[in-house]
């Protein structure tokens, strides 16, 4: 939609201003959720809707009680997750691979005593079809890893919520942010 050009003395209507300043595309912020104190999981509700097909979830700040992984599940589904990917330990030049087609979660990030890290993309979690998953994360200690994983959830369920669960220990602080990729 072209922008309206105004001249001196012209009356500006709310409709015209809203049309000029509406978001044009890209990422649209949906919600942020603060991670509590010494929690082993966090459920984010109202994350997915018919407004967007694809989503970005970030996990930043906070700390873990011990080095752990961030496991992501959609709704109450605890089966049917398949993913594969690579990971590298910072103290080694060896690239490692992993794959599973019977997982109960997606491996979505890392937690250390310094920070929590996760960047997760989901395609079609609200649509009643398979959800595609991509994640990459890094940790802030030399004895831990960076990863890049991709996979899917083998079902045709519409989801509005997700849960992040610590593989061990707990988390304190940090923020989970959810963004929608604008459909255009």
Model-predicted regions and their roles:
Residues 3-4, 8-10, 14-17, 22-184:
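Surface-exposed molecular-recognition determinants
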